């Protein structure tokens, strides 16, 4: 009995020693790590998830499997002193919190650098697994006088919500900010490199400098006031890894400029533009939405990207001509690169399983040499002259003042287009953006018929219905009209019709008929009014709230001021 007790005691002692050895040698690391309370869902810097390690760390990659040794002078992002970095630039009492950045800096400065944000992805994305052999990326972020708190959150969100082995580096390109330490101090953070321009270069040239310095095979461009969401990077890298000619963008969520609330954006949007070449968001057509019901997280082909956030193969970026280096400051570059990618054999996609928040401002916080309008027109003219062929005339019809803005030498870009064997703009319209209505050869004015911030609208009415005004939405549809050479004001096959030729009578929508005098209109007074030919009365909105638009005796009233967004007769 005594011998049996000794044996049991020995076995128990060996068992305890075995457990201790197992824990000490790392076999219990998952358990040990789980006891800390600092871990957060989706934080790739945690080590309490063996599943994540198995899925996302390449076999044999010892650095990815363990903790890397930092170079001298570097710190991990959780150890970076946010208070010291942000504190000296905070808005003082009595100062305008919007003055420096055109967003509420006070609210931005209150937030922690790794604040939690809602996971806005579709449920299917949260269950999806991504390839384990994805390439690493260099993240290029350019900035000029950015609020330190916003810039820091951008950097931290990249490091916190990305698999460490997929972030080769973060390259901050300081475009000659007033305070060099805005970027220099962030250079202490792991994986962050800082480049500073010795003069103001603008977004395009700064991004090219960052791309040229990048060491990874894939480039990720981000604006300097973003917050990356959970698992944002893998879906983008996977699409590029499958086809290097894809240029991919996340769904861009909204960070409110006033209170910095993070709000998920619709997944039913694509990038587009009007003939003024200003970027806009287009809703998918009903047919496109129906076709996605079986797979709502499938990539979305988009005619245009917003330009601030996208991922692209580095070698393809170089082969395709990088950016137009003669574009200045900001604006038009997304238009130019979108045309170039599509027309030269690539594609643009929005990836629903990738979400990145962005602070959308109503105006720019920095100055433009010559004014923002002139810079945008110059950049846009360069894109139009190189890529739009004969369709550029619709741009000049929409923005007549652009004709007077010098756009510089474009010979090298034209030669690039020829060298790459790019398709004509008509191909782009037919195959990539068929939703963009092209004016008919019979049209002398086209697009929205604007009165201040309101536009002429069918209000969903059909034949014999009245028309009204509604806030301009720039989406065509019920607000798309054309004035033809036959003097008809048309919406599809319906025309504005004066049934009763007396002042105050309501306008009706009726089927267009050739030579019907009730449907004849002309622009007068510098194309600022529409006069009915048969009655000499003018289109008027004064009765819009009580029943619909009418014709009235022509006069100086603002209710008679109308302007087509695209006027082909100047």
Curated annotation (Swiss-Prot):
**Modification Phosphoserine occurs at:** 535
Which terms does the record give in the GO molecular function aspect? carbohydrate binding; manganese ion binding; polypeptide N-acetylgalactosaminyltransferase activity
Instruction: Provide the tissue specificity.
Output: Widely expressed at high level.
Q: Which GO terms describe its cellular component?
A: extracellular region; Golgi cisterna membrane; Golgi lumen; perinuclear region of cytoplasm
Mainly localized where? Answer: Golgi
Q: Which InterPro entries match?
A: GalNAc-T, Glyco_trans_2-like, Nucleotide-diphossugar_trans, Ricin_B-like_lectins, Ricin_B_lectin
Q: Which cofactor is essential here?
A: Mn(2+)
Region annotation (Catalytic subdomain B) ranges = 299-361
Residues bearing carbohydrate:
29, 515
Q: What is this protein called?
A: Polypeptide N-acetylgalactosaminyltransferase 2
| Gene designation per UniProt | Galnt2
């Amino acid at each position: 009995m005594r011998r049996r007790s000794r044996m049991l005691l020995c076995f128990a002692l060996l068992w305890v020693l075995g457990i201790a050895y197992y824990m000490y040698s790392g076999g219990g690391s998952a358990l040990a790590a789980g006891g800390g309370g600092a871990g957060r869902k989706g934080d790739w810097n945690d080590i309490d998830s063996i599943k994540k390690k198995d899925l996302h760390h390449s076999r044999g990659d010892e650095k990815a499997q363990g903790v890397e040794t930092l170079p001298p002078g570097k710190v991990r992002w959780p150890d970076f002193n946010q208070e010291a970095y942000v504190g000296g630039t905070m808005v003082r009492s009595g100062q305008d919190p919007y003055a420096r950045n055109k967003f509420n800096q006070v609210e931005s400065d209150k937030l922690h650098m790794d604040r939690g944000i809602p996971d806005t992805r579709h449920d299917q994305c949260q269950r999806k697994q991504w390839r384990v052999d994805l390439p690493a990326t260099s993240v290029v972020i350019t900035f000029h006088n950015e609020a330190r708190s916003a810039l820091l959150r951008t950097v931290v969100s990249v490091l916190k919500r990305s698999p460490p082995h997929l972030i080769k580096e973060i390259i901050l390109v300081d475009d000659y900010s007033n305070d060099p330490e805005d970027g220099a101090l962030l250079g202490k953070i792991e994986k962050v490199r800082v480049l500073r321009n010795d003069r103001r270069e603008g977004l395009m040239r700064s991004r090219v400098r960052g791309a040229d310095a990048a060491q990874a095979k894939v480039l990720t461009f981000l604006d300097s006031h973003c917050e990356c969401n959970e698992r944002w990077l893998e879906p983008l890298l996977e699409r590029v890894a499958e086809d290097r000619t894809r240029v991919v963008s996340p769904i861009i969520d909204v960070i409110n400029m006033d209170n910095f609330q993070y709000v998920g954006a619709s997944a039913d949007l694509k990038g587009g533009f009007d003939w003024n070449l200003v970027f806009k968001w287009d809703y998918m057509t009903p047919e496109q939405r129906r076709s996605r019901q079986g797979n709502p997280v499938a990539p979305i082909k988009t005619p245009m990207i917003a330009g601030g956030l996208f991922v692209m193969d580095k070698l393809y970026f170089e082969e395709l001509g990088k950016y137009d280096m003669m574009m200045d400051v900001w604006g038009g570059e997304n238009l130019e690169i979108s045309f170039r990618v599509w027309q030269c054999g690539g594609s643009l996609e929005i990836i629903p399983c990738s979400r990145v928040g962005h602070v959308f401002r109503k105006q720019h916080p920095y100055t433009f040499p010559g004014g923002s309008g002139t810079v945008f027109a110059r950049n846009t003219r360069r894109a139009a002259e190189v890529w739009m062929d004969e369709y550029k005339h619709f741009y000049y019809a929409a923005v007549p003042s652009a004709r007077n803005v010098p756009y510089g030498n474009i010979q090298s870009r034209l030669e690039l287009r020829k060298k790459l064997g790019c398709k004509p703009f008509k191909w782009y319209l037919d195959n990539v953006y068929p939703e963009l209505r092209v004016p008919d050869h019979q049209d002398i004015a086209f697009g929205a018929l604007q009165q201040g911030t309101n536009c002429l609208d069918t209000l969903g009415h059909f034949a014999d219905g009245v028309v009204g005004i509604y806030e301009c939405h720039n989406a065509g549809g019920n607000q798309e009209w054309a004035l033809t050479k036959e003097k008809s004001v048309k919406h599809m096959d319906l025309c504005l019709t004066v049934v009763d030729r007396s002042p105050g009578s309501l306008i009706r929508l009726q089927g267009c008929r050739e030579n019907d005098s009730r449907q004849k209109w002309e622009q007068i007074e510098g194309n600022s009014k529409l006069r009915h030919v048969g009655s000499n009365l003018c289109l008027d909105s004064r009765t819009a709230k009580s029943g619909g638009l009418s014709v009235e005796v022509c006069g100086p009233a603002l209710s008679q001021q109308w302007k087509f967004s695209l006027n082909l007769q100047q």
